[in-house]
A protein has these predicted regions:
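N-terminal secretory/targeting leader peptides
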Residues: 1-62, 72-241
Length: 241
């Protein structure tokens, strides 16, 4: 944009509201935000469909749906009522089933288990007796380490090792619940509409490129970190539900 548009990035350490990003963008406190659509299920259950579904689409299928199968139009219909322009914001690829302090051997082992897991997966596990909670990313390690929760699902090898979960939870389960997880850019609709047309196009193209880049990087880093788990963390036991 030759300096016409600058984007300042604030982490949750500054705004202190990891689960309030939609509200902040809607209110104009931030012109733009980045998160995951399924966090807003308490406001509108339809938002969950734009992130992932258990046994649902993988990333290439999601992008085909968004751009050529009517997904963008459905997302616009849901977010128009919030005054927000929503756009695909990057994909983690298939996610792991979570880190557990104790091994899961039977369905009874889920009863009373305190676990951080969002979206449709949380709804499913709650039916099995799991006490589902949603904790901001910056608090996950401490919560698991102190036993505030018994298990958590975050992303996968691409990001989990950076969080250090392999140091405190010996059981790492493969996933079923998020075959691909699409994140979300949100732009205050009034602010977006006020931009000159060329800046609207630049921002849209930049978001699309960032989404593809995140997907490629996540896919690569998951493979690299998976190999690291086997070599550097022999204490971690890979399990399948």
């Amino acid at each position: 944009s030759n300096g016409e548009m600058e984007i300042r990035i604030d982490s949750s350490n500054k705004h202190k509201a990891a689960f309030g990003i939609l509200d902040m963008v809607k209110a104009g406190q931030y012109e733009m935000g980045h998160s995951a659509s399924y966090y807003w299920k308490g406001k509108d259950v339809n938002t969950m469909f734009f992130t992932t579904m258990p046994f649902g689409m993988i990333a290439p299928e999601q992008y085909a749906w968004f751009y050529y199968g009517g997904g963008m139009e459905l997302m616009k219909k849901v977010y128009d009522k919030h005054g927000v322009y929503s756009f695909p914001g990057g994909n983690t690829s298939n996610q792991m089933g979570g880190w557990f302090r104790k091994e899961i051997n039977t369905l009874d082992d889920f009863k009373g288990l305190k676990m951080r897991i969002p979206g449709f997966a949380g709804e499913v596990l709650s039916k099995l007796g799991v006490v589902v909670t949603n904790i901001p990313p910056g608090e996950l390690y401490t919560a698991l380490d102190r036993g505030t929760i018994d298990a958590l699902e975050w992303v996968g090898p691409s990001l989990d090792l950076n969080m250090g979960f392999q140091k405190i939870a010996p059981y790492y389960y493969t996933g079923w619940h998020e075959p691909a997880t699409e994140l979300q850019f949100m732009v205050n609709q009034a602010k977006f509409d006020a931009l000159p047309m060329h800046l609207q196009k630049i921002l849209t193209i930049a978001m699309q490129f960032a989404a593809y880049d995140m997907y490629a990087r996540s896919y690569h880093e998951s493979a690299v970190n998976w190999a690291s788990i086997e070599k550097e963390y022999p204490n971690v036991k890979i399990r399948t539900f």
